[in-house]
Swiss-Prot record:
Name of the protein described by the UniProt record: Aspartate--tRNA ligase
Family statement drawn from the similarity comment of this UniProt entry: Belongs to the class-II aminoacyl-tRNA synthetase family. Type 1 subfamily.
Keywords (A to Z) from UniProt: Aminoacyl-tRNA synthetase, ATP-binding, Cytoplasm, Ligase, Nucleotide-binding, Protein biosynthesis
PROSITE patterns: AA_TRNA_LIGASE_II
Length: 577
């Protein structure tokens, strides 16, 4: 039962030779006494022709869709008048067909998988994964992993696995908890990231580390989130921020070239967090298209339009001509993202009509010049608190992108860095400061003295995000290696010494034993492959994902467990109220 090759490996070297192929029956047709089969494996499709007088005919007549079959025959070029170019110009004339296994009728047609409800696809994931599109996604993922491994191995990195059962520590999301049978009433947590362990490896002297780490976060799900996911996790000793960014650019460029034959221009552009928010309304801006937010606060200060005159910030976005229905839809987007509304104007020569046009007569020339709006185009405004205004108009910017397909004429991929994030952010609900990334991020050396002062909100973090086509695909930082600075960071976020030691005592002890300067990054590997493949969701690039309710419909998880198992763990279950 030895096959000659995978179907996709057949080439002109096999022409007019006997080949043995194995795979699934993609389609079967009877035509004028002939049987035509499409045989499929992970690498491609080939047409098989079975003639009425062939000894293979009786077996071929039994085949149905998704049967597993072995075909032996002559690989030949199809007649010239049937050729269309590519692999379809060749076929196999069968001399022997063997049914290796039968199959039930699938619950959906595999070649129409995109139109099938996602829950059906996930319930029968083993069938969904037979579809060529899904196989392309997972093969791309495999090639990307291989490219990463080759690059990092050649760059002196050591691959180390870190624990899957660890201590529950505050990292932003809820932990998945695992009860300990041997220690009743105590729990492990599944890791949200290997953050502390990779820093401990730097303290241990391993210099450069990486792993494809499985991570777990019990949070609300959306199109690009899963409760269990894969990070490409990396850490380097004796580095500054530029060293990490330079190596990451080389790695990203290598992965794209090795998997997609795409050359990424380097160096990647860098934006500060403030500039990204101020110009694009996002800390992960999609830079494949030019459109940017423009500040026009000064043009309306003291003016008669009260909503703008008193606003901390007035931002404008220029767009092409929009219908009233489209403007209403964009206003809905703005309101969903915190704006009170969306003011607008239409340019008509040297003036404006519609919307708030009666309030802008005297500043029309300056608005036209500053915004760059074309004649007939539309201006969209958001006003109020700076962050709310830019965030709302940033969401509108992306909606306009989708409305006019603004990325179609730009580069297929655009990679950039966002740097200089705030170290801390103030939580209005609790009235306390919290970390923006995690509590081990090093402050900018010029700002560290601001800890504990009224200006600690101005501290810049040595943190950086890697952004691809408007998706954050990586995030990292230079880490705190000085125990005194780490203590100040814990104090800034309201941890008492006892609280800090309860959560991170083992790590605080380790910092006292000669910690080198170090920094690192983690890529959201599922999200990266999603963008590279053009998939609409990370569920399309994970073999066995959960749905958007966190359920595995195929394995029927999560599920109830019996009382005996719970008793053995010392765990009781409260009925939901």
């Amino acid at each position: 039962m030895k096959r000659t090759a995978l179907i996709g490996q057949l080439s002109t070297t096999h022409l007019d030779q006997a080949v043995t192929l194995q795979g699934w029956v993609n389609r079967r047709r009877d035509l004028g006494g002939l049987i035509f089969l499409e045989l499929r494996d992970r690498s491609g499709l080939v047409q098989v022709q079975v003639e009425p007088d062939s000894p293979a005919f009786a077996q071929a007549d039994q085949l149905r869709a998704e049967y597993v079959a072995e075909v032996e025959g002559i690989y030949r070029a199809r007649p010239e008048n049937q050729r269309k170019g590519g692999a379809a110009d060749y076929e196999v004339i069968a001399s022997r067909v063997k049914v290796l296994n039968t199959a039930k009728t699938p619950p959906f047609e595999l070649d129409k998988g995109e139109s099938v409800a996602e829950d059906i696809r996930l319930k029968y994931r083993y069938l969904d994964l037979r579809r060529p599109e899904m196989q392309r996604h997972l093969l791309l993922r495999s090639r990307a992993m291989a490219a990463v491994t080759a690059f990092l191995d050649s760059s002196g990195f050591v691959q180390v696995e870190t624990p899957m059962l660890t201590k529950s520590t505050p990292e932003g999301a809820r932990d998945f908890l695992v009860p300990s049978r041997l220690n009743p009433g105590e729990f492990y947590a599944l890791p949200q990231s290997p953050q502390l362990f990779k820093q401990l490896l730097m303290i241990a002297g391993y210099d450069r580390y990486y792993q494809f780490a499985r991570c777990f976060r019990d949070e609300d799900l959306r199109a690009d989130r899963q409760p269990d996911f894969t990070q490409l996790d990396m850490e380097m000793s004796f580095v500054e921020q530029d060293d990490v960014l330079e190596l990451q650019e080389g790695l990203m460029a290598h992965v794209f070239k090795a998997t997609l034959d795409v050359d990424l221009p380097r160096p990647f552009p860098r934006l500060s967090y403030f500039d990204a928010m101020d110009r694009y309304g996002s800390d992960k801006p999609d830079l494949r298209f030019e459109s940017a937010l423009v500040d026009v606060t000064d043009l309306f200060q003291g003016g008669e339009f009260k909503a703008f005159a008193a606003a901390q910030s007035v931002k404008v976005l220029a767009a092409a001509e929009l219908t009233r229905k489209q403007i209403d839809e964009l206003e809905r987007v703005a309101k969903q993202n915190g704006a009170g509304g969306l003011a607008w104007l239409k340019r008509d020569g040297d003036s404006f009509t519609g919307g708030i046009s009666k309030f802008v007569g005297s500043v029309a020339p300056q608005l036209i010049k500053r915004s760059g709006v074309q004649d007939g185009g539309t201006l969209l405004f958001a006003a109020g608190d700076w962050k709310k205004a830019v965030t709302a108009l940033g969401a509108v910017r992306l909606a306009v992108r989708d409305l006019f397909d603004l990325t179609s004429s730009g580069p297929r991929f655009h990679v950039s860095w966002v740097t200089d994030f705030p170290q801390l952010e103030f939580d209005e609900d609790s009235g306390t400061w919290t970390y923006m990334h995690h509590p081990f991020t090093a402050p900018h050396p010029d700002d560290a003295e601001l800890f504990g002062t009224l200006r600690q909100g101005e501290i810049r973090a040595q943190a950086y995000d890697l952004v691809l086509n408007g998706f954050e695909v990586g995030g990292g930082s230079v880490r705190i290696h000085d125990p005194a600075v780490q203590t100040k960071m814990f104090e800034a976020i309201g941890f008492t010494e006892a609280q800090a030691r309860e959560k991170f005592g083992f790590f605080m002890d380790a910092l006292e034993y000669g910690t080198p300067p170090h920094g690192g990054i983690a890529w959201g590997f599922d999200r990266l492959v999603m963008v590279m493949s053009g998939a609409s969701s990370i569920r399309e690039v994970i073999a066995f994902p959960k749905n958007n309710r966190g359920a595995d419909l195929m394995a029927e998880a999560p599920s109830l467990v019996d009382d005996a198992q719970l008793a053995e763990l010392g765990v009781g279950v409260l009925s939901p109220s």
